[in-house]
Amino acid sequence: MSNTLKWNDATVDYGLLEKVNPVFNTAKMTLFQLAANGNTDAAALVRDMGLTLEATQNSATTKASPEQVLGGTIMLEIRYRTMARLAEESGDTLVDLPCGYTPRAIEFAKKGLAYYGLDLPAVIQEAAEKIPALIPPEQKKLVRFRAVDATNYTSLEKALEDVDGPVCITTEGLLMYFTDSEAGTLCDNIRRILEKKGGCWYLADVECSLQYVIVMRAGGRPVHGNHEECFPAG
């Protein structure tokens, strides 16, 4: 399969994109880890997108050890489930920022809950094509994907202009890629969105390093499922 995708007269070189923006490859790594943990919707997306362990857990410059993959996978599942539970219990429209390729849109749609996935244009191009295909036809209208610049308030405001009522914004795996100035701008933008629409913001990133250390110190405990069970030969 070509490493270049043409979409609406735009050409995206995904190999180059990983070099200049590591967030892109991290999104696919997250999806693969969720699939390895036994998430069937994530596994379906992984197969549809043709992702592999080697391609998603490593890059041209780094290679993760089995222990690092295991620790990251455990931490990811804890965070993913916690954020989903908080968002669902809020009763507000979920705004996943960044949404990546996770199957949360599928899970919320199946429950009849509205979902807005916001991310970089290149991620949205793929997510908006692959994810709705796994959502029952009568529930597709609950899911919307929007390309945004999280450091630009106008971009966020426009992406959410058709949301009626309060929002629950969830953020996982984003701030570590921002400078202090960019992180401050994001916080200001989220504050303005919440002042306008009401709701809440759940941010997992501030405890990410501590969670990883705790998981790695626990060491050697099995996760739910494994790569062979999720992706049998053939």
Region roles according to the model:
Residues 150:
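Hydrophobic anchor residue in the Rossmann-like NAD(P) cofactor-binding loop of oxidoreductases
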Residues 156-158, 213-215:
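Short, well-ordered secondary-structure micro-motifs
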Residues 226-234:
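Short alpha-helix
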Residues 1-95, 99-146, 154, 163:
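Rossmann-like AdoMet
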Residues 168, 187, 192-210:
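Conserved beta-strand signature within the Rossmann-like core of class I S-adenosyl-L-methionine
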Residues 160-176:
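Short SAM/SAH-binding signature in class I
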Residues 108-110, 160-162, 188-195:
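Short, surface-exposed basic-aromatic patches at helix termini and helix-loop junctions that form
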Residues 145, 155-156, 177-194:
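A short, conserved alpha-helix within the catalytic core of class I
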